[in-house]
Amino acid sequence: MLERLLDFVLGVWARISDRTISWTRLPFLMALAAIIGHRVNLRHHNLIDTETAPPDLSGRKIDGLPEDFDPREFRMPDGSYNDMKSPWMGMAGARFGRNVALSKGFAERDTELLSPNPREVSRKLMERKEFVPVESLNVMAAAWIQFMVHDWLGHGANDPKRKIEIPVQDDDLWPPNREPNAPNGPMNVLATGADPSRTDADEGRPVTFRNVETHWWDASQVYGSSWARMERMRREGGKRSGARLENGKFWVDERGLLPLDEDMQEKRPKQELSGVNGNWWIGLSLLHTLFTREHNAIVDRLRIDHPNASGEWLFQKARLVNAALIAKIHTVEWTPALMDSDVGRMAMRGNFYGLSGERLAKGFGLVSDSEVVAGIPGTPTDHHGSPYAMTEEFTAVYRLHALLPDQFEFRSSDDDRVLFERNLTGVAFGQARTVYDGATFDDALYSLSTQPPGAMVLHNFPNTLRNLSKKPEEGVFMDLAAVDILRDRERGVPRYCAFREALGMPKITSFEELTSVEADQKLLREVYGTIDRVDLLIGCMAEFQSSRQPKGFGFSDTAFRIFILMASRRLKSDRFFSTDFTPEIYTPAGYSWVQSNGFRDVIRRHSPALAPHFDDVRNVFYPWDRAG
């Protein structure tokens, strides 16, 4: 009763403060109260279920899954049975939910879909003229969020039978490889794969899409979202024909590197294998390798206390621990690095430790069932009235491609001398593995940890990704910036002003209010005509350079509202982070591993020689100290 009353008061305070003065201008305690109040309001109004006919999993068999596999003790490979009463919830193949009312979530069609032209939006507002860095962060911060997104979501293969044709202007040299004097364009983009589960019950409702990965924060980017995928990485050389490791570990080679993906070698030579290995680059290679090694280290620790346990038991318990550690790192390290202010750090770390703080949590364990007091882990599971799911709006605000540089410099971790340089193409897909031919794993990790990522502002989208070769032999290229704009429209994500309205935020009424940069005000007016037409991604990047931008934040306040809601939801809805985050489920050693370790410890464990470079750095997502 008391907590409900507190929620009511905080919710009212959040609405009042939003109408009068932004929380970003309030004193610490008042700002923190407003942020918590925004979460209360968003939970009440912005968790929307899209399922109309959830699947019945009774009697289902998964090939290869041991008969004694207990979903109460372990995470199911496909994410099912996290919620024992609704076992389909959050599993791979379940629909994306929404963070806006269904009436606000209809996809744009026909001329609206291409108005204004996504390619022209890319050219005039997103093209990187010169690299705008974030000097307070390192490139591993950019790699980390892609590592997380691959855990949470994927829309799967596009529909080869449905093409969206984007016209190009006469002065637009597209595609990049066209013959001299050949006609321009158009740019053809495959439509997002349709949802085959729609029935008559979906008539008159917005378009839906299915998540091909599990919705849960279960490290599926490392472990995969199916038993078959998980099995491949437990076999010699990552080959289906390889001998299975029965010790509970992943297979790594003699250098501790990942196996190569046997299915991809013809198309993408040297492409590495992991749970999710799409859109691969050296930053992902480093993180997947680190947490594959971390899994094996956790297995070694668990075996000390459980010498007679089977390899399967060790593997699945280690997965629980590894996934929880990754979630903790994101919550208390990565997110505060991107929200580098007193209130931002407290708000996000509070998801894990509550207002009582880290020291009390580590010293006395769970001191309250209140998530505000003690943090979410260990408190009762709560879906807040809507089945758990990742959402289309969450996908939209995590379009953070501007964080990526176009150029990389690889240097020795011993003396900082330059070993070689590569562009983004030269470190992507199978080329990522070739980095280790001229630099050690430690050198590569050191190099990315001492270089800055890009800022989430206009005119800073990587040009490599704006001229991306998909099938160059067939003349198929892609402008990912234009595709980002198109996807939000295609999937029914409201445009910037409508999005803010759907979240209960104050209305932006002019381009001058949107951004403080006069040149961008002019360009935005030229491209969009009216403020209501501005796309969500463009609005968020423009907002970054305004008086409303939260101090120390790496993204806009508009995007932050979704983070407030969904960061807590990923923990609170997940049984293994809430009710079952206990020593009994994780084992005492596993539970302690999560509580006592962070990203700094993971790196020190697997690359101990790098410790002097980050020992004096407050957060390992900040730039490390240079060698020499």
Regions found by a protein language model. Name each.
Residues 303, 311-314:
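Mobile, glycine-rich extracellular loop/lid and propeptide segments
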Residues 1-297, 301, 320, 324-482, ...:
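N-terminal accessory/cap region of cofactor-dependent oxidoreductases and related radical enzymes
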Residues 506-510:
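Extracellular/luminal domains of secretory-pathway glycoproteins
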Residues 314-320:
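Alpha-helical scaffold segments that form or flank carboxylate-/histidine-based iron centers
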Residues 500, 513:
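Residue-level "edge-of-site" marker
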